[in-house]
């Protein structure tokens, strides 16, 4: 199973959760589970093998939140064995990383 973690941080405000949803949807991911502190999205089937379909989980870590920063742990994963470093899951991870960077609200570090 390929797993690629990201750590995103943002200034906590009312739009944080919606901003996380917007970032994931901008990567053509479909939101399949959404709670106050957890979001799961998946790649829409589009001609790629089932094992390569990517799931993205985002956990908003409110326990360590400060007035200035809140952490969101993001994991991009699929069932594909990562035989090559440039695989489908890693490309989706790169896309998610770039989407977070493009949003002025977020700061991202690779996990």
Can you say where each PLM-predicted feature lies in the sequence?
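Ser/Thr-rich, low-complexity intrinsically disordered terminal regions
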Residues: 1-111
């Amino acid at each position: 199973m390929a797993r690629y973690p990201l750590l995103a941080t943002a200034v906590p405000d009312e739009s944080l959760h919606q901003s996380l949803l917007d970032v994931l949807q901008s990567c053509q991911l479909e939101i399949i589970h959404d709670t106050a502190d957890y979001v799961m999205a998946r790649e829409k089937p589009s001609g790629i093998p089932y094992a390569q379909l990517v799931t993205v989980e985002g956990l908003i870590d409110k326990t360590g939140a400060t007035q200035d920063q809140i952490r969101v742990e993001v994991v991009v994963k699929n069932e594909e064995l990562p035989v090559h470093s440039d695989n489908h899951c890693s490309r989706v991870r790169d896309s998610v990383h770039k989407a977070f960077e493009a949003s002025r609200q977020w700061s991202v570090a690779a996990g």
